[in-house]
């Protein structure tokens, strides 16, 4: 069966333009491919002046202006759509609630699922567009029978398929990723932008969480949830330190622990468990982080759901590596067993399954199994 990247026919494309170089080049490539492209910048902050500190953050008035200038150079219509309230409800408040519950969310996945390929896509389809184009590094491969598959980018070093693993068949059918099927370095993308006359060619990349411009996640959460002093305990339950809010930690964390009593072996301690119920954080040795299996909920499939147990590779973080697993859907939940123990797996994170380069689907980690103990 033959396969081709993306789609050959001319489409009405809505290009999401963040004001950065990747989305600008993606829009330019879509237009160059012959599609009827319109640019749109998403206003996601009620206070856009506070969304950037240096190279951090995004979604500012400056970004909107950069996106408009890029659209003018490309020669496409351009609009700004205000989705700030939807973003606050579906991404920011979800982020806060997940941390408050002791879990570790990924707001980029949630934004793709709820904003770019839901709120934006729905509005685009209602206006007669065929597809939404973004600057993500991933590939949509169309099989001979018309089936669309999400694959890793040709350049594995820049692959972003993990944060797109939440897309279902309907969303994937209207997704366009012009950057994903070529092996190019970021310097080459910037050089292409410069050749095209795009002023964003030298604009720094944004980093970290877009709505936490200074990168201080704990400070952001403390401002929203307030300080709540509690104990840091070791595996025996002995108090070894204190904290100002259990919500400010994540499984596997080492830095920022206020521990007054050193470990008997003198080795570093890591966060093993977070209990919002009694506001305690449990710490222990690195070896205690070894996870052999996990259960994940709310699975979303890029194609048909697996009908039985299978062998896959799994990715657990946006910039994490692959690991071999067996996985099976049991009573609507994904049961995953690792071929070798892995560390730093936190409830709330997404597990994305791959068959080679193809994204099979994703689910949200609910519990993990370490040796003989399940952690929720």
UniProtKB/Swiss-Prot annotation:
GO CC annotation: what is one?
Answer: cytoplasm
Q: Which cysteines are joined by disulfide bonds?
A: 111-210
According to UniProt, where does the site described as Interaction with tRNA lie? 136, 349
Per UniProt, what is one GO molecular function of this protein? ATP binding
Q: What is this protein called?
A: tRNA-specific 2-thiouridylase MnmA
This molecule's function is given as: Catalyzes the 2-thiolation of uridine at the wobble position (U34) of tRNA, leading to the formation of s(2)U34.
Which SUPFAM superfamilies does the record match to this protein?
A: Adenine nucleotide alpha hydrolases-like
Enzyme Commission numbers on file? 2.8.1.13
Q: Which organism is it from?
A: Streptomyces avermitilis (strain ATCC 31267 / DSM 46492 / JCM 5070 / NBRC 14893 / NCIMB 12804 / NRRL 8165 / MA-4680)
Superkingdom of this entry's organism? Bacteria
What are the entry keywords?
ATP-binding, Cytoplasm, Disulfide bond, Nucleotide-binding, RNA-binding, Transferase, tRNA processing, tRNA-binding
Family affiliation: Belongs to the MnmA/TRMU family.
| Main subcellular location | cytoplasm
Q: What class of enzyme is it?
A: transferase
The answer to whether UniProt assigns keyword Disulfide bond to this entry is yes
Q: Where in the cell is it found?
A: Cytoplasm
**Record-annotated residues binding ATP?**
16-23, 42, 135
Catalysed reaction(s) here are: S-sulfanyl-L-cysteinyl-[protein] + uridine(34) in tRNA + AH2 + ATP = 2-thiouridine(34) in tRNA + L-cysteinyl-[protein] + A + AMP + diphosphate + H(+)
Gene Ontology annotations of biological process type: tRNA wobble position uridine thiolation
Active-site residues (renumbered): 111 (nucleophile), 210 (cysteine persulfide intermediate)
NCBIfam families from the UniProt entry: PRK00143.1, trmU
Annotated stretches, region: Interaction with tRNA: 158-160
